[in-house]
């Protein structure tokens, strides 16, 4: 019997997940299909119960349901609970189990371009929203000890840091202070929507004094190179856009659902082609 997978969200028509997962199923000769489901906020509970009744094997969760879905699940992974959001659900033995692969996917993406272990690196996160929270706790989970958080409102950065449970040294900074301190970091991670199309001229941080070998990563992938990445490249930094994070979090969900490891390079190439790159 064909296995059913999918993604729920609103809007959902722009989702790149179906083409990525369906191609992986085809490549691995798996009898499965991945479908995008438009789900309004007011019917989320009914939608989740309906998917469970249909026998869906697993599904992704995107905006605006990542937090609200938690009350409709049978079990939530400890890391997802710490992050406070779920983006992947596994249907196992009649139970819906929620996970968060955003942060771990980002960590794997970062590891793919870093020539050294992340554990000894000093990292600066720009932003203190949901994506930053997922990345912060996932970095802490793999043993990173120095993670500072810069945000327009410093109190929000302080709230994120205060929620930590691991042994992590963290300081909350204003964006102005982060601009001054940027040369002290090995890795800078941009987690906000600043610089996303159509506001491509905006940047949360002017790159002006990076040290040699700095990695600058932006979770945005439209445009492929945001202003912060362009400035970082001019400074000689190693840069990474959000395509890698998207692909690695999707590949991790695929692995959790099926037990099979998809071809990351193939997934990435498909996404780039769909984005017109």
Swiss-Prot record:
Protein keywords: Amino-acid biosynthesis, Aromatic amino acid biosynthesis, NADP, Oxidoreductase
Pfam family, one: Shikimate_DH
EC number(s) on file: 1.1.1.25
Involved pathway(s): Metabolic intermediate biosynthesis; chorismate biosynthesis; chorismate from D-erythrose 4-phosphate and phosphoenolpyruvate: step 4/7
Annotated positions binding shikimate: 15-17, 62, 87, 102, 221
UniProt GO cellular component terms: cytosol
Binding residue positions for NADP(+): 127-131, 151-156, 219, 242
Active site per the UniProt annotation: 66
CDD domains according to UniProt: NAD_bind_Shikimate_DH (cd01065)
Signal peptide boundaries: none
Entry-linked SUPFAM superfamilies: Aminoacid dehydrogenase-like, N-terminal domain, NAD(P)-binding Rossmann-fold domains
NADP found in the keyword field: yes
HAMAP family associated with the record: Shikimate_DH_AroE
Subunit text: Homodimer.
Function: Involved in the biosynthesis of the chorismate, which leads to the biosynthesis of aromatic amino acids. Catalyzes the reversible NADPH linked reduction of 3-dehydroshikimate (DHSA) to yield shikimate (SA).
Listed name of the protein: Shikimate dehydrogenase (NADP(+))
Organism: Bacillus cereus (strain G9842)
Gene this chain is encoded by: aroE
């Amino acid at each position: 019997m064909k296995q059913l997978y999918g993604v729920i969200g609103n809007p959902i028509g722009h989702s790149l997940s179906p083409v990525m997962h369906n191609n992986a199923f085809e490549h691995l000769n798996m009898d499965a299909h991945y479908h995008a489901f438009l789900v309004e906020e007011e019917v989320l509970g009914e939608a989740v119960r309906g998917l469970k009744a249909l026998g869906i094997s697993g599904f992704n969760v995107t905006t605006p349901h990542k937090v609200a879905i938690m009350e409709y699940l049978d079990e939530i992974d400890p890391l997802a609970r710490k992050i406070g959001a779920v983006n992947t659900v596994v249907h196992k033995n009649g139970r819906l189990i929620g996970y968060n692969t955003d942060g771990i996917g980002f960590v794997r993406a970062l590891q793919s371009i870093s020539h050294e272990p992340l554990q000894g690196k000093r990292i600066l996160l720009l932003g203190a929203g949901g994506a930053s929270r997922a990345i912060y706790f996932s970095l802490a989970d793999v043993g990173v000890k120095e993670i500072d958080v810069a945000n327009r409102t410093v109190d929000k950065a302080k709230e994120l840091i205060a929620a930590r449970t691991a042994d992590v040294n963290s300081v909350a900074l204003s964006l102005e202070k982060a601009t001054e301190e940027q040369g002290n970091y090995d890795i800078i991670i941009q987690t906000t929507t600043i610089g996303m199309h159509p506001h491509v001229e905006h940047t949360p941080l002017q790159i002006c004094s990076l040290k040699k070998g700095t990695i600058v990563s932006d979770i945005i992938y439209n445009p492929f190179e945001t202003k912060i990445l362009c400035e970082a490249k001019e400074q000689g930094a190693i840069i990474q856009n959000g395509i890698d994070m998207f692909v690695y979090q999707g590949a991790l969900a695929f692995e959790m659902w099926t037990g099979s490891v998809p071809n990351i390079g193939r997934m990435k190439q498909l996404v780039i082609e769909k984005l017109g790159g």
